[in-house]
Each structure stands twice: as C-alpha cells, then as structure tokens.
Amino acid sequence: MTQKSLTFDECKQLSSRIIAMNPNRRANMGQISSHLLDYYTELTKQPWLAQLVGQIRDLTAQQNQMMQEEMKAGETYQQLDRKITDLKKQLPFRSPHYFHFLEDHRAQKFIDPEAFTFQTTVDIDNPEEVEPAVKNALLLNGMFDEPTEKLFREKIFSAEDIELWKGKVLHIERSARNKAHIDIRIPVGMTIAEAQSAFCKLIHATEDPSCVTPERIIFITDAASQIYTADDWYKRLDKEAVAEYREAYRKRGLDIDGRPLDVDSARSGASQ
C-alpha cells in the first residue's frame, strides 16, 4: 500500500478529514506526518495489520489465563510481556490531538497549535470496564432511540450531561490488547485532561492521567477492530467553531489548543 507524500497544506486542499499518523511497520516513534483519512481506512484493511493484531491478542489471552491462575510473577509471564511489547512497537500509530506536527517530528516543541483536532482519546485499560464503558459511551452519545434505552439514559445521566455530550463520541475501536479506545470531541472550554476526566466519570471508567499529553499516540488496529466511526471523526472544524473554542481558551488564559501559554515548563515534565 503506497501513497504519494502530501504536505499538510495539500491535505487541507483535498479533504476536511485529515489524520497525523505513521502508517509504517516498526516505525520511528518520533516521525509522524499528515494523511487523508481515507489512507487510514485503507491501512486498517491490510492483512499484515490484522495478523499482527491477532498475534498480540493471542499472547494477551495467554497472559490473562496466567493471571487467573496467579502465575503473574513467573518468567513465562514476563517473556510473554516482552513479546507483546515488541509486537506493539511494530504497529502503525496515530495522533488523536493534532492533524500536523512541525517538520513531521512528534514532540511537544514541534506541536502546531493551529492544527489542534479538538478531540482526544480515552483509553479503557481495565478489561472489566471495557464492555460497560463502550455501552455507556454510546448511550450518552444518543445512539439508542428505543423508549427503554431513552429512559435508562435519562436515569443514569443528568439532562445537562446528555445535552453536553450528545454526538461527541467520534470513534470506538478495540485496542491491540482487546481493550478499548474511545475518541471524543472535547467540549468547548475544556482541556484534554478535563474532557477525559469528565467523560470517564460519566461512563464509569478508570481515568488514566498518562493519556493526556498533547503528543501522545494511539496504536492503530485493523478494520475488524473498528466498532463505531462518526462522520466528523478527524474532521477539521469550520472557522466559526474553531473561533468559539479558541475564544473560550483565551478567556481562561490558555493557548489556542488549550495548553498553558507558558508551555516550556509543561514540556520538561511531559513524556515523549
């Protein structure tokens, strides 16, 4: 699968749906470039990716069985863990937070604030939380119209929460280790961390503070792992919507992508 290399500006001219990713196997984790979202879709259909995801899940299942048998401390478990880590490094990856990084270099000092996606990815890492969290996310999103589902939604969520989060679930996929990634639109005025925290509380999922760094990546899984995709996932917002977000951040003394204006201090402690 090949694609002519496009600049971020060229991508913007061709489509409103753009993704920053590295589509290669065993890719350099510091390199990332802008692509049309259609290229991502084609990538998920590649047999090698499905095979790689399958290998990771098979090894993960073996690990889970060992955990049930209380064999987590053994050498075999650690060997499986190393194999899984190596295989995960072979996966292509995407940026949930930016359409573009300066010089195609994935690091905080190369972030392009103008290319903020106004979305983030919630990582559901606890296996026992995956199914309920996905169900709650779709319910909160307004996906179910049956009377019983509506009543249940109104019972477990407040009217304000339903109004705020309706339509903000953009994408749900199974992760390589058979957990879940839920991509959400960040509500106006919220930062990445605030949006993740608020959403996790509502869907009863454990919040992962390590998942809020601006330059974080998400490993890409195959087409069969995709559960739900909204039409505006990785879609560049119109000028009016962008202006509303930026004004809300400005009133809080934040940069146009919700980061502190003095980002140098934040960079030093953030993971790469």
Identify the residue ranges that each predicted region occupies.
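A short linear-motif detector with a strong N-terminal bias
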Residues: F93-L102, E160-E163, Q196-C200
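Histidine-centered divalent-metal-coordination microenvironment in nucleic-acid enzymes
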Residues: L164-T191, I217-T221
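Short aromatic/hydrophobic-glycine micro-motifs
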Residues: Q46, E75, M143-F144, I162, ...
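Catalytic micro-motifs at enzyme active sites that drive phosphoryl/nucleotidyl and oxygen chemistry
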Residues: R106-I111, K150, I156-A176, A205-P209
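DNA replication initiation on ssDNA origins
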Residues: M1-F118, E128, L139, K150-L151, ...
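Short amphipathic alpha-helix segments
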Residues: D125-L164
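Acidic surface patches and DE-rich sequence motifs
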Residues: K72, S175, D255
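DNA replication initiation modules
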Residues: E10-C11, I19-N22, D38, E103-P132, ...
